[in-house]
Amino acid sequence: GDTVTDRSVGPAQWGRFLCTVFDEWVRHDVGEMFVQHFDAALAAWVGHPPGLCTFAPVCGAAVVLEHNGDLYSCDHFVEPDHYLGNITATPLAELVGSAQQQRFGQDKRATLPRFCRECPVRFACHGGCPRNRFATTPDGEPGLNYLCEGYRTFFGHINLPMRIMADLLRQGRYADEVMAILAQEKQGETQEPVKIG
């Protein structure tokens, strides 16, 4: 929901957590351990769809079906306003393709505050999950993702390694080569240059 409690992770904490885990992963585990947020980020740097609705430009592809046949727009929105119908009465494809569901999906992009639309990491974030858009922007516009500060920190932090991995992939090489590149850079060594676009 839109309530922050003493048990909620703070935006800055979330960003530090993601950065800390990423730093460990990018130096030791690329190609061995797959972290959904990192895979989605790499997809953004390569220019592919994220594979994670949180970071997609629009929502609506991940409906939720209840045991009684009730269908809702998303698992974060199992509530009356987002009830699409019941599959025992209406075909699933019709409900998923309904104007209501299409509007739900497009609203993710259409309701982005200006702060988000002008953000340098929008290509990777797209405002995050609409369920978390209950904060206000620095200029007071509603609709900012509560975790924005953390995501901005994270996506800024991973920019160089992501660019390296994206360029490796574009060259037909493996993304896990980033581990050796970063290790050599840390030691001040040089190696075969990787074009970073």
Say what each PLM segment does.
Residues 15, 19, 39, 43, ...:
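Generic detector of well-ordered alpha-helical segments enriched in charged/polar residues
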Residues 29-30, 100, 173:
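Residue-level recognition of short, well-ordered coil/turn positions
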Residues 1-54, 58, 64, 76-87, ...:
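Radical SAM enzyme [4Fe-4S]-AdoMet core and its adjacent flexible, acidic
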Residues 68-71, 79-82, 111-197:
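Radical SAM enzyme core and accessory elements
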Residues 50, 78-121:
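Membrane-interface junctions of multi-pass transporters
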Residues 30-37, 72, 104-105, 127-128:
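Acidic/polar loop patches that form or flank catalytic/metal-binding clefts of enzymes
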Residues 52-54, 108, 137:
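Residues embedded in well-ordered secondary-structure elements
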